[in-house]
Amino acid sequence: MDQLSAHLDRGWDLAQKGDASGASACAKRALEIDPQSPEVHNLLGYTSALSGESEEALEHYRQAIALDETYLEAMLNAAEVLMHPLGEWDEAIDLCDDALEYAETKEEMADCLLLRVDALLGKGDVEEAKKCMARLPDPPFENGSYVFLIGRAYYELGETEKAAPFIEEAVRVDPSHADAHYYLGLLRDDAGDTRGAVESFLRSRALDLAKPPPAWAPSPETFAQLVRRVIQSLDALLGRWVRDADVYIVDVPGAELVVDGVDPRAMVILDARSPDEPLLPGEPVGMQARLFIYQRNVERSAGSVLSLESELSSGLEREITAVFLDRDSASPPEKHQLN
């Protein structure tokens, strides 16, 4: 193996483990060897995205595409960054269309179309997303992960009957697939199968806990400092409900809470009442709120250390709004909206 390939292989290995700084160092060493390598710029883009540097990532991906206009992987990586966190849905859709012209295998076609569906959903164009799903190639695929990805896409489109066989097959093929068990729980919950949903959610929770935290995950002490900072920086209208709350930080919701109906991947749970409500018998004076923050779930949703603060802030805002400000709303908050 030549030196360039060795640096690239090592860089991708570290990137897949979440080690953005290590992967970036490998990519920079590869760049010194060949500044005109599209593969190097693709890796640099990936490590930049992993570090939360979206604009820099996009610049590297565009450079990779400029060096190789048929570079499908760089196109799709760029589309992902355009979608999240930049929210440039139309540009992402255009890139998916460009990539589709160079897709040769069923798997490559599925990659392009599924990412296009995500962008269309982000844009709010559900009908066009459904048409896009109809263009997917038929299974089987060489990689079994596409079965789950197709099922998940159908679920996000609200087509649960189409989603069910794909999600069930994903669980059968890979019993250790945490996401597949989670979506199976959602399907069972929607179908009114409470016991089955709880079993799937508990399995998903156990599998999530069995995975090591990402390499970039902060220590519990550092995360606690971030939580305090986020609470203090909340909008005054929202922050007044939780500024004096008792805050508890754990990895994920307890199994007993999941059995009682709590989403195992919830980021935040606020157990509180309005200051105007009377005390319950035996309740201590001054007790108004308990705030539970689930670090592993926040990390999963954030995807990078630089996104932790904004993701936690958004989760807190949604939870406070749902608990206090939407109490009298005619329409209840959507299930699993924290995910």
Predicted segment positions?
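Start-of-helix register in tetratricopeptide repeats
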Residues: S5, E39, E73, E108-D111, ...
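Canonical tetratricopeptide repeat
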Residues: D9, L43-Y46, N77-A78, L115, ...
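Active-site scaffold of zinc-dependent metalloenzymes
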Residues: L270-S314, V323-N339
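TPR/TPR-like (Sel1-like) alpha-helical repeat modules
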Residues: D98-E101, R172, A178, L186-P213
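Position-specific recognition of the canonical hydrophobic site in helix A of tetratricopeptide repeat
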Residues: A15, N42, A49, M83-H84, ...
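Structural marker of alpha-solenoid helical repeat scaffolds
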Residues: I33, L67, Y102-T105, P139, ...
